Design a protein with these regions (language model features):
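Aromatic-rich peripheral "rim/lid" segments of glycoside hydrolase catalytic domains that contact
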Residues: 31, 47, 51-54, 236-244, ...
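Aromatic- and acid-rich polysaccharide-binding/catalytic face
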Residues: 95, 101, 131, 169-210, ...
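Membrane-embedded multi-pass helical conduit in multi-pass membrane proteins
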Residues: 334-386, 413, 682-775, 791-862
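Cell-envelope/extracellular polymer assembly enzymes that use nucleotide-activated donors
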Residues: 419-422, 451, 592, 607
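Short, acidic, metal-binding catalytic loop of nucleotide-sugar glycosyltransferases
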Residues: 439-449
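A conserved acidic beta->alpha catalytic loop
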Residues: 448, 456-468, 485-488
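Long helical/loop segments within the catalytic core of UDP-sugar-dependent glycosyltransferases
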Residues: 470-507, 520-602, 607, 611-614, ...
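The conserved acidic donor/metal-binding loop of glycosyltransferases
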Residues: 512-517, 600
Length: 862
């Protein structure tokens, strides 16, 4: 249940959230919209219509639109007389609207001739209210016509009509071609600050500046601003943000200036035009003052707010956060106020961002395609959010728990009370000298009753296993050696064989790897925890003794240390530790009741622990080191070891999914289910991240080949993976300093080593979803240190991904003309961040290929 501190923090953070939304949406008082403006750019296409496919509105639909604008404007500007759009002029006259009549000029001269002939005809039939004529819209800007061709068209039209004639082009075209001016009756100029990346706060001044620039250059020509406006949605162009609030601000401010200065202008535009998305992207659809349903998009007279109706959005955000915190605080009795506050901050930030993300995406006109893309992106974003919340929860519990609620407790026992222990040491093709050290350490255990069973399975070379057999005979009756060949089931098969050979009086089974040298008090200190009859497992940490050998092993040591001093501690709070196949003790009765070690799973230790939990038994984790083994000698073995762990995790999830989700009866608690799912989420995220990278590369290649039609992904969705990466980095550095007592160098080394395994884990995750069995891989001991080139070759897949991502980034800046836009830069940053794990793999492989690089460069952790 949520205690009073949790409730107080929830409500306080809720209040701060409301305040934040209120500050962001503080009303801006802007000049009121005039009763009647001078003119609208008029394209009456509806949602399903596009002139690009010859789909035009009916005469009745055009008349409805003109009736809506009557009284709102004095005039409308048209762009073509094609099809029913030639009826705009007569229909406008019926609504007392003047017309600036336009003809569309393209590269097709036959079509241009027909368009001009119809333009002249429409003008002559409606000359009483057609006040100006435009021949061509940005034909020079597009490169469809030359200056000489446009002059010929102007001469042709001016010869047959008596209204003022011009062509419509942006301001720079008029300055670039002064020879045009003497062939027009007025200058029809487009001044659109958004396309030029001008901040909305400077946009009106920019329009005035360009207007005055033209006025100075051509003092004898009247200037008509044929297009001026701001889109309500679209890509951010330098300082120009396309938002509804910015559209309202710009237009209301401009209209006030235009009225004061006496400008002749046409607002771009009356209605949103969905068909323009193909030409101009999302911004092209959103220039209208009215939306597709012919409703005003913003307030004309009242103050402007950034997000109209934000009160409802903040209510949704707070409601979602309260539900989220009710779950996160459900089992957090020992969490300090700082931890609760941190979780509340993260929860409110995430829900606020999620609500804003959905609202922002929904502002666009959703087609079936954009809706499908949005759903896929939202599902991906939801996955990132879940991982981020799980990471935040672990950080809070690791940093701010008081005190630990589930500390291990043992009852001192006399020698007579201590149960017999059977120590099992599985081995396959292990160096005999190393094995002798392991056995010598076991021989001096300070424990009254124990036996040691060494099971060598499937080693072919007798010179490897016979010295171990002889040494067991020398150590006496407590040591028994078994060489079995063939023996199925890998390590689990060997352990099950040992269980069959175990002394009937043994109550506890202890397992260590063949390279571990244990301390004499290992069993004496650990076995008393079984005085609790519910205790099924007592687990110690994995630890290593060769961290000082070189820099590579020092990095590996730092990476291993994090889980055993952070993750296992927090999992122990809810009786949800991961059992490891070394330094572990299991109650024999429990081991036999659950069916022994699972020979189907290559991570038989973790799978056994989960089965024991499913039967309702307890486990405890003792963070003190009682034995040390050997780490992988090179990067290839480091990767293979982690591949096996990650692959086994997927198999366990698949095999036990029904129990973990509560779909079949078991005695798993909610906390255990949470930790087993949430604990493997980061690995699952690595798998999805690989799929994301492949998709990102494919999308970027499409952006390079079809730059005009394939935009970069929405910035909102790009921000989430960036946020997760930064959060995980900060979390790792913070907890390593706080819980592992690592230096900054050691923390960074641990992070680098962990990142270097991301691709390996991703491959293991994806492989685990499509296969059910893969061969067991033992971690070699005293393997040859890889030469540098060989070590780098072990990271060849990562190198290919790094090169692909790097080339994608370079391509964006070399190929795309819009590479200076915010979304391109953000997407490039995403690609760069996605490349960091691959770069980390190359760096770790490089370090692993230099076995003489001293450990002091990292700082060995003892």
């Amino acid at each position: 249940m949520i205690n009073r501190a949790g409730l107080l923090i929830t409500f306080l953070m809720g209040g701060l959230t409301v305040l934040l939304w209120a500050v962001v949406n503080q009303p801006d008082v802007e000049p009121p919209w005039p009763t009647t403006i001078q003119g609208f750019c008029f394209s009456p296409m509806r949602a399903t219509q596009t002139p690009m496919k010859g789909q035009f509105p009916s005469t009745a639909e055009i008349d409805e639109d003109l009736a809506l604008l009557a009284g709102e404007a004095f005039a409308v500007r048209t762009y073509t007389v094609e099809s029913t759009l030639g009826e705009v002029a007569p229909l406008a006259g019926a609504h007392q609207l003047n017309v600036m009549l336009g003809a569309w000029i393209s590269q097709n001269e036959a079509e241009n001739k027909a368009e001009i002939e119809k333009l002249i005809k429409v003008y002559r039939e409606n000359h009483d209210h057609v006040v100006r004529v435009i021949v061509g819209n940005e034909a020079l800007l597009r490169g469809d016509q030359t200056v000489e061709q446009m002059i010929d068209h102007l001469k042709r039209v001016r010869a047959d009509i008596w209204a003022p004639v011009s062509l419509a082009e942006p301001w720079h075209i008029w300055l670039q071609y002064p020879e045009l001016v003497k062939h027009v009756d007025f200058i029809a100029v487009h001044i659109l600050p958004y396309w030029e990346g001008i901040d909305v706060e400077k946009a009106v001044d920019y329009v005035v500046f360009r207007y005055e620039q033209l006025k100075t250059a051509y003092p004898d020509k009247r200037i008509v601003i044929a297009e001026v406006g701001w889109p309500s949605n679209g890509r951010t162009r330098k300082g120009a943000q396309a938002t509804l609030a910015n559209q309202a601000k710009f237009l209301r401010r401009f209209l006030a200036v235009a009225e004061r200065e006496g400008y002749i202008y046409y607002i771009m535009e009356a209605f949103d035009q969905l068909w323009k998305r193909q030409l101009e992207g999302e911004a092209g659809t959103n220039w209208g003052v009215y939306n597709l349903d012919r409703e005003p998009k913003f307030a004309f007279t009242t103050p402007v707010v950034r997000m109209p109706g934000w009160q409802g959005l903040v209510a949704i955000s707070i409601g979602l956060t309260v539900l989220l915190l009710a779950v996160m605080f459900r089992d957090s009795g020992g969490l300090m106020a700082r931890g609760r506050g941190f979780l509340a901050l993260v929860a409110y930030a995430i829900t606020t961002f999620a609500v804003w993300m959905v609202w922002e995406y929904s502002r666009q006109y959703l087609t079936p395609a954009t809706l499908a893309v949005g759903i896929m992106l939202f599902i991906a974003a939801l996955g990132v959010i879940v991982v981020l919340l799980a990471e935040a929860h672990e950080l809070a519990e690791a940093a701010w728990m008081r005190p630990w609620r589930n500390p291990a407790r043992s009852i001192p026992a006399s020698d007579e009370e201590l149960p017999m222990v059977s120590v099992h040491v599985p081995a396959y093709n292990e160096p005999p000298d190393m094995m002798l050290q392991t056995l010598d350490a076991l021989a001096v255990l300070n424990y009254p009753r124990f036996e040691v069973l060494v099971i060598d399975n499937n080693t072919k070379d007798a010179a490897v296993w016979q010295p171990v057999q002889a040494h067991c005979e020398r150590l006496g009756a407590k040591f028994r050696f078994f060489h079995v060949d063939p023996l199925a089931g890998f390590k689990a098969g060997a352990l099950n064989f040992a269980l069959q050979q175990t002394d009937p009086n043994a109550e506890i089974v202890a397992v260590i790897d063949s390279d571990y040298i244990v301390k004499p008090d290992w069993l004496r200190d650990m076995v008393p925890y079984f005085s609790n009859p519910e205790m099924g497992i007592v687990q110690g940490p994995q630890d290593y003794r060769d961290a000082e050998q070189n820099a590579f092993k020092a990095m590996c040591m730092a990476e291993y240390r994090g889980f055993f001093h952070i993750g296992m501690i927090t999992r122990n709070e809810r009786n949800a530790i991961i059992q490891h196949g070394t330094m572990t003790l299991v109650r024999r009765r429990v081991l036999e009741e659950v069916g022994g070690w699972g020979e189907w799973c290559i991570t038989e230790d973790a799978e056994l622990g989960l089965r024991i939990f499913e039967q309702g038994h307890k486990a405890t984790y003792i963070p003190q080191s009682y034995g040390k083994g050997l780490m992988p000698d090179n990067f290839a073995d480091f990767k293979k070891q982690r591949f096996r762990w990650a692959y086994g995790a997927v198999l366990i999830l698949r095999h036990h999914l029904a129990e973990l989700l509560g779909m079949v009866p078991s005695r798993l608690t909610r906390g255990q289910r949470y930790h087993f799912i949430a604990g493997w989420l980061p690995w699952l995220a690595d798998g999805f991240n690989l799929a994301f990278n492949l998709g990102a590369l494919a999308w970027t290649v499409s952006m390079l080949f079809w730059p005009d039609s394939i935009p970069p992904p929405n910035i909102l969705f790009a921000l989430l993976p960036l946020s997760l990466f930064v959060f995980k980095l900060i979390k790792m550095l913070f907890l390593y300093r706080r819980r592992v007592a690592a230096t900054l160098r050691q923390s960074l080394a641990a992070g680098l080593a962990g990142l270097s395994l991301s691709h390996t884990i991703a491959r293991a995750m994806l492989t685990g979803f499509i296969t059910r069995k893969i061969g067991f891989f033992r971690t070699p001991k005293f393997a040859s240190n890889s030469a540098l080139l060989r070590s780098l070759m072990d990271a060849r897949e990562e190198l290919l991904f790094l090169l692909a991502l790097s080339l994608a980034i370079v391509g964006l800046f070399l190929v795309r003309d819009d590479s200076d836009m915010m979304d391109i830069r953000v997407w490039s940053l995403v690609l760069g961040v996605q490349g960091i794990p691959y770069l980390a793999a190359l760096l770790v492989a490089f370090i692993g290929g230099l076995p003489k690089l001293p450990a002091r460069l990292v700082g060995a952790m003892n």
